[in-house]
Amino acid sequence: MTALSRLAATVEARKGADPESSWTAKLFAKGPEKCAEKFGEEAVEAIIAAVKNDRANLVYEAADVLYHLTVMLAARDVSLDEVLAELDRRAGTSGIAEKAARG
């Protein structure tokens, strides 16, 4: 099991937890919109770290992005496996061809 798979399993397990006992459960209790907002905030922080060429902070913020992406997906009942299957589907297809196929 990869670190990302373990993270997804832990996040999923927190869905029904007491919001006072878990940060993840607290995010779920605030609703999917708040989960999406937190993902956006963390993405911006990662972008800033990248623009500033702050490697250590970029690694830190990228981990936050992955965590909050996982929470946001779970809040909308989208599994990590679904996202990975989409990546597998796209494998071997150029980005240009994939974008053109979307219209």
UniProtKB/Swiss-Prot annotation:
GO biological process, any: L-histidine biosynthetic process
Gene3D superfamilies: MazG-like
InterPro entries assigned to the protein according to its UniProt record, in alphabetical order: HisE (IPR008179), PRib-ATP_PPHydrolase-like (IPR021130)
Location(s) in or outside the cell: Cytoplasm
Keyword Flavoprotein: no
Keyword annotations from UniProtKB, A to Z: Amino-acid biosynthesis, ATP-binding, Cytoplasm, Histidine biosynthesis, Hydrolase, Nucleotide-binding
GO terms of molecular function: ATP binding; phosphoribosyl-ATP diphosphatase activity
Main location: cytoplasm
Entry's Gene Ontology cellular component terms: cytoplasm
E.C. number(s) listed in UniProt: 3.6.1.31
Catalysed conversion reaction: 1-(5-phospho-beta-D-ribosyl)-ATP + H2O = 1-(5-phospho-beta-D-ribosyl)-5'-AMP + diphosphate + H(+)
Pathway as given in its UniProt record: Amino-acid biosynthesis; L-histidine biosynthesis; L-histidine from 5-phospho-alpha-D-ribose 1-diphosphate: step 2/9
Entry similarity comment: Belongs to the PRA-PH family.
NCBIfam families: histidine_hisI (TIGR03188), PRK00400.1-3 (NF001611), PRK00400.1-5 (NF001613)
The name this protein goes by in its record: Phosphoribosyl-ATP pyrophosphatase
Organism in which the protein naturally occurs: Rhodobacter capsulatus (strain ATCC BAA-309 / NBRC 16581 / SB1003)
